[in-house]
Amino acid sequence: MKANKLSAITLCILGYAHTVYAESNMQTEKLETIVVSSEDDSVHNKNVGEIKKNAKALSKQQVQDSRDLVRYETGVTVVEKGRFGSSGYAIRGVDENRVAVVVDGLHQAETISSQGFKELFEGYGNFNNTRNGVEVENLKQAVIQKGADAIRTGSGSLGGTVSFESKDARDYLIDKNYHFGYKTGYSSADNQKLHSVTAAGRYSDFDLLAVHTQRHGNELRNYGYRHYDGSVVRKEREKADPYKITKQSSLIKIGYQLNDTNRFTLGYDDSRNTSRGTDWSNAFTSYNGGPFLKDVRHTNDQSNRKNISFVYENFDTNDFWDTLKITHNHQKIKLKARLDEYCDVNGEIDCPAIANPSGLYINDKGIFLDKHDGEITHKKEGEFNNYFDSKGKEVRVKGFNVDSILINCDQYDCSKPMQLLSSTNNGYGGSPNKYIYKTYELFEKTMNNGNGKYAVLEIRSSGHEKFSRVYLPSEKGYVENQWKDRDLNTDTQQYNIDLTKSFKLKSVEHNATYGGLYSEVKKSMTNRAGYEAYNRQWWANIFFGKENNKPNKCQPYNGNSFTTLCSHEDRLFSFLIPVKTKTGALYVTDKIKLNDKVNLDVAYRYDRIKHDPKYIPGTTPKLPTDLILGRFIEFKPKNTYATQDEKNENAEKNAVYLASKKTKFSANSYSATFSFDPMDFLKIQAKYATGFRAPTSDEIYFVFQHPSFSIYPNLYLKAERSKNKEVAITLHKQKSFLTVNLFQTDYKDFLDLAYLKKGSLPYGNGGSQLETLLYQNVNRDKARVKGLEVNSKLHLGDVWRTLDGFNLSYKLSLQKGRMSSKVGEEGKQRDTNKLDTPMNAIQPQTHVVGVGYEHPQEKFGVDMYLTHASAKKEKDTFNMFYDGKDQKDQHIKWRSDRYTLVDLIAYVKPVKNVTLRAGVYNLTNREYGTWDSIRSIRPFGTTNLINQETGKGIKRFNAPGRNFRVNAEITF
């Protein structure tokens, strides 16, 4: 019924549109352009296949992240990755690395897209394998290109492109010499607090822009967040995991206007995002109850981006250019996933290693006392020795030999004696043990390893009795923290030259752009792991023990040979060989105006990409030995039993061999758009464009060896390619328009992980072999996506002046897509060339209806959006892990249901320099989950899990219920 109601609304808008368009008198407009920006932008300025939002539109819609950017768009969504947040976009049936993300002309970090790597590591939360985001307050403009378009961005633009352009001082200093702005806001969905300061100024020939933004918030609170039991852990947890999220960004640009035609700009862009929390839903999380130690997974994930840029612009018109722009960028991106596993749930309650319920301590005089400042006493009950505080409550202490206890003089003033509960050793046939407080002198000594001072305990004269034991807390006094810190690094150096030239040949007008780029991108991985004695209590700081009868400050007095008070870090290692990717590109475009009714836009680009891996033994982070042992160079130990040194040497040789194999790719990309305006109110357009994605270095070089699953490199992969065809009809008048667009995008040479055969691995002694299953990345799939998109906006003032300021809008996206399936037994599979396998990245049918009003002088405005998404049908999903055995269902069991949302956003300007904005989202408090969120659920691993049988835990993937957002901005 809801879908039918939406259809009625659609017919209403189209009916209005027909009346308007029949009388229209418009200039040329381009195909399927969706512009959500200021109302002053005319329809004919929209570009082919774009969604364009400027800074004003972003503020009006209260956009704070990538999800908000596409909230009211159809045919483009955000990829979800659970704990790590979002990861790029999904357009035309493909996602992540197949949709280019660009900031100021620079590609952002790509995910490690090798399916083998994803299966081995991504499902366990070991890596922050996402695409970094961008700070909205820094943006001048965001442009989303639907469909293949390699002309703009080169590799990666298989299904589309999302590009961002940062602000410049000139954006604020058009008619004044200074600007200051401050924005503050709050979002209830994630408890986010926003503070942003913008300052711009001009002095003489110099200008400056500085934007600093801070966001402090928490996890996105799913529907019903407050009512779910927070003590439930692992895959059946319904409540979102708790995180504290901090985002800080600084954008600085200094410009120097040498003269009217020459300008230099130096830029600095630094963004740091941190998310700290507890991974309660992870399958490795210990239960709160039971006798086991409560080791908790503490996450500390980061996404950091820093770019330093230099830009030279020239506006001297000559035979070669009207404008010239030369740019150099140095960008560094680090995506970090850190995990610390230690107990701190409820301090002493759940962490017995640091429990001290009696409040035992040593006072300023060196006396060992309880929390009541009383002494500890002993009482023998049957065969057991028990110890009590001054109030008669049992105390956890244990006796240790005096000779085994040492004092850390770096933590305790060893000039003072100690009074400790002590006992004689007169049992076993002699007199009963005596338990009394004795005073010990401390004699300082120097550690042989230079690690500070220590002291031994020597009892003051006590007659013939020998006190050989002292009593100290029995608990370890520290929590063991096993930590892992894994970074994915992308370091880019890029040079661009871009030129424009307008000219006329006979009666034909040409607006040409041309140029090129050269970039070097270094991609690497660093894995660090180690141990630390975390949350050390006083007794673990003051006392220590011996190892092999020698003083060792790393040895707990109450531990064993497997425990330590000292932190250590393992050797740096990596699962990937570092690779430098060199890219060179040349491009040319020409917007040709043949006459007043016919326009032709043509473009060509050539890309050449070279992967150059580097591995230097002893310098490059080491690949784990077993990962590559004997893969290319046979392992032949000298003796029957191989030594570890021999294995390491062979592994290093294999890594060097793999790194010697360079790979190259080249691509020719084309784009052509034909526009015909047979009448003043009608435009007909046809577009053809191509895109490609060169294999990433990890898809080529990733190697992994294990008896149950081995992946071998493939140096002969081809680039993925796409062809996009569109036809559109646009009716328009003044600011009102209706565009109906039919499109088809064909993909081929999709990269996929394929089973090859059974193989063998070197194992144990020199002649032993172990069977394994061999996999490899290959090109094989082809795919096709077809669809219909409608985009319309009716300004009622174009129909009736009395309704000036009111507007209606409607958007629709309907897509269907299939890729070729595989047949045959493992190792002999082939494509059927039949497009019969669903593509999961395609969104269900989506409608967005908008009703709005804006005051003619922009003193206030209000917009209401109604979004309806259909349910994701079972037949339109594909279980990529389907094998007919362990995974018997070839479709995805858990899918998104249909939902309808209502959002209300308003703003008011009480005075010229102040703007107040507020929005209520999911006004009807609907419980729902988006398809992108639901499809992030994994069937195996440890993260993003639910109970696949009952569905328990799926509510954790729901979107927020009713929530609000407010902000205030002041400008001068």
UniProtKB/Swiss-Prot annotation:
What's the short name of a Pfam family annotated to this entry?
Plug
Q: Explain the consequences of disrupting this gene.
A: Mutant cannot utilize hemoglobin as the sole source of heme for growth. Mutation attenuates the virulence.
What compartments host this protein?
Cell outer membrane
UniProt keyword annotation of Iron present: no
Keywords, in A-Z order:
Cell outer membrane, Membrane, Receptor, Signal, TonB box, Transmembrane, Transmembrane beta strand, Transport, Virulence
Report membrane topology: Multi-pass membrane protein
- Write out the residue ranges of the motif TonB C-terminal box: 955-972
Q: Which InterPro entries match?
A: Plug_dom (IPR012910), Plug_dom_sf (IPR037066), TonB-dep_rcpt-like (IPR039426), TonB-dep_rcpt_b-brl (IPR000531), TonB_Hb/transfer/lactofer_rcpt (IPR010949), TonB_rcpt_b-brl_sf (IPR036942)
Question: Where does the signal sequence lie?
Answer: 1-22
Q: Where is the TBDR beta-barrel domain?
A: 175-972
Any one of the GO CC terms: cell outer membrane
* Residue pairs linked by disulfide bridges in the UniProt entry: none
Q: Family, per the entry?
A: Belongs to the TonB-dependent receptor family. Hemoglobin/haptoglobin binding protein subfamily.
Cited function: Acts as a receptor for hemoglobin or the hemoglobin/haptoglobin complex of the host and is required for heme uptake. May be involved in virulence.
Protein name, UniProt field: Hemoglobin and hemoglobin-haptoglobin-binding protein
Q: Which gene encodes it?
A: hgbA
